[in-house]
Design a protein with these regions (language model features):
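Signature of the first transmembrane helix
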Residues: 3-66, 102-110, 134, 165-169, ...
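Specific pore-lining/lateral-gate transmembrane helices of multi-pass inner-membrane transport
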Residues: 73-95, 262-374
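Hydrophobic alpha-helical transmembrane segments
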Residues: 125, 129, 158-207, 223-224, ...
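Small-residue-rich midsections of specific transmembrane alpha-helices
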Residues: 18, 24-28, 47-76, 97, ...
Length: 492
């Protein structure tokens, strides 16, 4: 329980930078959807370009974030030697990412003409140049950020993340509201400024590192990381392939960016699941490797999975139930796509479960399994998108995510229970999923059938959510076990 409380504490701190940060970034969605007219397709351009940058970031980091945790954790070393060892791991990882980043920048700036023509940005190659610089700096920042997580410096981590977000929001408000800009150019330009500033703030941390490159360690790292790279590529394609493929396969090319803008803006509401999963990952990943030698590790992993699902399902219900209010996050022109939000959220939950399941092969250094699972899910997603986007548009994108993540999740669970079984509480998990489905149907059916107004709908849906919370408190999380307020409910 102490370890789980520590996990919850770290998740809360990382969540400050992830969940609160993303929530603050929601302020940019109404900003963009108000100042960028739907007909311009500029929001679709932003969605498309950021999809490419997400994929490139995975390529440049080369699975080295997880590799850093795997190689830096060594309980046999004394604290002093352990620090030198972890610095050597960090140095070697940075050498890999730095080399890949330099090669990437040389290729982009050397062949910007053909690249911009191929991707449909011949008129605006500067979009790609700015975002190439952004993703290069993001890749170089990713390893120091991971090192902060390894060192359990959660406050420093969260502070830098939140500073970036504050700068980004402030500059966007200045350019779009004060100066009245309407072009997507300024979205990329502001990102470049903010990313560059945060990169400079890492200089003091980098100066404290005892730099030492280990060639022998690098060989073992690459052997460990390349399946993670494949896993990462397949995983990120599951997240962004729809946004990359959409302009390529949608029959009306002139309308493609408009439709993609609608989908991209509505997906922002569903991204609360990505926030929770990311915050949980930041806290959980270092702990998993550190706890891998403990006798109670399987029980811990099973409990972590259960509580992850409980809170993501609660978040799902909150978003679905409070949609009459949350819809105002995006501009009125873009709200026609709100129906995809629950579908995308379900896909994100599956992705989170898949992430939790993935540790069985990481802990036994069989990361190749993850590569195969993610590749299978990616192929399913590609097939659904390519076949159905021409007919069903962005609805195919949403269901493609469910199909892709669902495939990877099921494969990982089935193989994992044979190779490295973990006693997940499947009956309890099934109850929570069934209750979530029932309450979701109730919140959609009853207000629509009886023509509730927005206020009455919010009250009714909130009562449904309270039913779910009541079940949690009764079954798995009694008030007496909660931090801070728990002491008031414990028996004397």
């Amino acid at each position: 329980m102490a370890n789980l409380k520590g996990l919850m504490k770290d998740t809360a701190i990382y969540g400050l930078s992830s969940i609160v940060g993303r929530f603050l970034n929601y302020l940019l969605v109404p900003l963009y959807t108000h100042y960028m007219p739907k007909a311009s397709g500029d929001y679709g351009v932003s969605t498309n370009v950021y999809a490419y940058t997400a994929l490139i970031l995975v390529l440049l980091t080369f699975g080295m974030e997880t590799t850093l945790f795997r190689f830096a954790n060594d309980d046999r070393l004394t604290p002093e030697i352990g620090r030198k060892h972890s610095d050597t791991v960090f140095s070697t990882v940075m050498a890999v990412v730095g080399t890949l980043t330099v090669v990437f920048l040389l290729l982009v700036f050397g062949f910007i003409g053909p690249i911009s023509n191929t991707l449909g940005y011949a008129a605006h190659p500067e979009y790609l140049q700015m975002m190439a610089a952004v993703v290069a700096m993001d890749a170089l920042q990713a390893i120091p950020f991971s090192y902060l997580r390894y060192q359990k410096r959660a406050i420093r981590f969260a502070s830098l993340k939140l500073l970036f977000i504050a700068l980004n929001i402030g500059l966007n408000v200045f350019y779009f509201v004060v100066l009245g800009k309407t072009s997507v150019y300024y979205v990329f330009f502001i990102n470049l400024l903010c990313t560059g500033f945060i990169s400079l703030l890492f200089i003091p941390d980098l100066l404290k590192v005892h730099w030492h490159f280990d060639g022998q360690m690098l060989k073992r790292m690459l052997s460990y990381s390349w399946p993670i790279l494949i896993l990462g590529i397949a995983g990120i394609l599951n997240q962004v392939a729809d946004k990359i493929l959409f302009p390529l396969v949608y029959p009306d090319q002139a309308q493609a960016n408009v439709e993609l803008g609608i989908y991209g803006s509505c997906v922002k509401i569903a991204m609360i699941m990505a926030m929770i999963t990311q915050a949980f990952r930041y806290a959980y990943e270092p702990i998993v490797f550190a706890k891998s030698k403990d006798a109670d590790k399987t029980e811990y992993y099973a409990s972590a999975m259960k509580y992850f699902l409980i809170f993501t399902l609660l978040a799902f219900l909150c978003v679905v139930g409070w949609m009459p209010l949350l819809q105002y996050i995006i501009g009125e022109e873009y709200r026609e796509g709100l129906g995809v939000v629950p579908i995308v959220m379900a896909a994100e939950i599956m992705m989170g479960v898949y992430f939790n399941l993935s540790f069985w092969y990481k802990l036994i250094d069989k990361t190749i399994y993850g590569a195969w699972f993610s590749l299978a899910g990616c192929l399913v997603l590609f097939a659904v998108n390519i076949i159905f986007i021409p007919k069903y548009g962005y609805w195919a994108c949403a269901w493609g995510g469910v199909a892709g993540y669902g495939t990877a999740m099921v494969l990982s669970y089935m193989v994992g229970q044979k190779k490295n079984p973990i006693p997940y509480p499947m009956r309890s998990i099934a109850y929570y999923v069934a209750l979530t489905v029932m309450l979701t149907l109730t919140m959609n059916y009853v207000p629509a059938t009886y023509h509730f107004g927005s206020v009455v709908t919010l009250i009714f849906n909130s009562l449904c959510i309270c039913c779910f919370v009541s079940y949690i408190l009764q079954s798995d999380l009694p008030l007496s076990s909660l931090p801070i307020i728990g002491k008031y409910f414990r028996k004397k």
